[in-house]
A protein has these predicted regions:
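Short, flexible hinge/linker loops that cap or flank conserved catalytic cores
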Residues: 2-4, 130, 173
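N-terminal Rossmann-like FAD-binding beta1-loop-alpha1 element of flavoenzymes
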Residues: 6-34
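Nucleotide donor/acceptor-binding cores
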Residues: 7, 30, 134, 176-179
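Short amphipathic alpha-helical segments
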Residues: 22-24, 46-47, 148-152
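Glycine-rich FAD pyrophosphate-binding loop
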Residues: 26-50
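Glycine-rich active-site loop/strand segments that organize a redox cofactor
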Residues: 46-89
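Glycine-rich dinucleotide-binding loop and its adjacent helix/turn
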Residues: 69-76, 82, 86, 140-179
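Feature captures the FAD/FMN-dependent oxidoreductase FAD-binding
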Residues: 77-142
């Protein structure tokens, strides 16, 4: 027999939408588990760390509105916030509302199928866990999978390659390199 974890709701992704859903689903009394493929919260703001990354939406419009206290304690430093500031904000939200306790980091949902007999979703994760849930929320976002265009010779290129969706957290030194 396979052990199955069971939650009222499962959220896939811990970016801006996923964090919001974890908070709201908890607020209405549901047990929640979120699965995030990355090692931290933030979604696109976790993965896209390239130089100059910033939001094209004004900071006050890019803030959660479910908590007046949160809005009072967080002060954006720029009208159009940078990636590091947005990532700090989302980490602050995750800590402020203790959202991490319901997130399995470094875990993908590999399969989701609806079982009509049980009236539940049955999921398989990349950690070989089986999970059952009544409500399944996909919060993976439009930028969750990187797109690599077909470029002749890319597979034989011996130099370093960087994609904006997966830029190294420690940055890249281009000094004395031909780019």
């Amino acid at each position: 027999m396979i052990d199955t974890d069971e939650f009222d709701a499962v959220v896939i992704g811990a970016g801006i939408a996923g964090l919001y859903m974890i908070h709201r689903l908890r607020e209405i009394g549901l047990s929640v588990r979120a699965y995030e493929k990355g090692d931290g919260v933030g979604g696109t703001w976790y993965w896209n760390r390239y130089p100059g990354a910033r939001c094209d939406v004004q900071s006050w419009d890019y803030s959660y509105t479910f908590s007046e206290e949160l809005n009072q304690e967080w002060n954006w430093t720029e009208r159009y916030p940078t990636q590091p500031e947005i990532e700090r904000y989302l980490n602050h939200v995750a800590d402020r509302f203790d959202l991490r306790r319901d997130i399995d980091f470094g875990t993908r949902v590999d399969q989701a199928r609806f079982d009509e007999d049980q009236n539940k979703w049955i999921l398989r994760t990349s950690r070989d866990a089986t999970v059952a849930t009544r409500y399944l929320v996909s919060a993976v976002g439009a930028l969750s999978e990187r797109f690599v265009p077909k470029i002749n010779g890319i597979e034989t290129f011996a130099g370093e390659q960087y994609h904006t969706n997966g830029w190294p957290a420690e940055g890249v030194d281009f000094e004395n390199k031909r780019v």
